[in-house]
Structure formats: C-alpha cells, structure tokens
Amino acid sequence: SPQGVSSAASDVYKRQAQMSGVDFSPASLAEARTLARRCNTPIDYHESDVFLAAEVLPQGNFDLVYTGIGALCWLPSIERWAQTVGALLKPGGRLFIREGHPMLWAINEDHHDSLRVELPYFETREPLVWDDENTYVETDSPLKATMTHEWNHGLGEIISALLAQGLDITGLVEHQSIPWEALPGQMVVDERGEWRLKEAPWRLPLSYTLQAVKRGG
C-alpha cells in the first residue's frame, strides 16, 4: 500500500531516487501523500489499478520495482502482475518483494492450537471471500465495507510468471517470521519485533524475500 511505502521510502529518497506509487483508492492515496510530506519525501502517486500501471507510468523506465508485504493476495492473476513488473523495469532494473509465504496463506488461522492446511495454495479462478471487521490499520471508526476477496499464488507460480517476463531470479530467502500475528494464539514476538511460531518455528515458512533482475542490462 502507499502508506507503507511512504514510511519506507525516505531511506530510498536519501539516495536521490525519484519515486512513483500506484493505488486504486483515492483515500489511501490522500493518506500516502500526507505521510510522504511528513517524511519530506516527494513521491509521484497515481490512482490506477495495478494491472494498468504501465499505462499511467513510463514503460521501461524504472530501476527498481518494490512490492510490499500483503499486496499479492489482492490480485487475481500473478501473470498479469508479472507483466506489469516486466513492462515498468528498464533492462538491468530490479524487483524486490517481501511477502507473506503462500504456505502461510494456506493455513486456516481459525485453529489456534494446530497448523492445518485447509485453504488453496495455488492460484484459483474464484477468490476466497471473507467478511471481517478487523483491519491492520489503527482506527476507532467501524468498517463499513467488511467483505474482502483474496487469492493465493504458489511460489512456483510467482517465479514462473517473472521468468516468462524476462526477469532472472537473483535471490530467494524464506523466513520464519512475519510483521503481524498471522496465526493468533500460536505466535510470539521475537527480538526484532516480528512474529514467529512459539513452538517449532521450523515447521512453516511465514514470509519470503525475492529479488530479480530484468534481462538485457
């Protein structure tokens, strides 16, 4: 989301980077611009579906595309996302992802005493539909729109989609931690402020970091 990117982007800006961001929500963009000003970080934001980002941003012009954690689950097609990434990057440009692991998304979090794979690991045509009043954003106001639609994408599907768009994978690390309590009742906070399984954390990857470079640079 732009909110998350704004707070992280100040470090990138210190390296004299020119940054752009895309989101389909006018409200999210307004908040993102406020945070960017607060961080004294100029970011060129555009209101657009991420699949249309290559139509509102200059194609083949970016040195780095960053996809933040918790973004891919909102996208129905990982191939279309990879097409967008490939269209935006210049030859030699890099993609960086920190994302929740698809194995984690396949675990049913309603079981607070066990790990049960009960949800799709691979991309499906139809989304998972949730009706939930909870949000990761701190707010005192009740949510009016509580229905969400999500898709999982297997790690192989993600890698294959990027390879098909002319990117080479340069790094892939699976992590035993994630920034939020993804499995309530089964996690503890570690010394870095991230959450991990309190019992036998080696059982399940919770997130991953992927880096790739567009061929031709």
Predicted regions located by residue number:
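Short alpha-helix
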Residues: 148-172
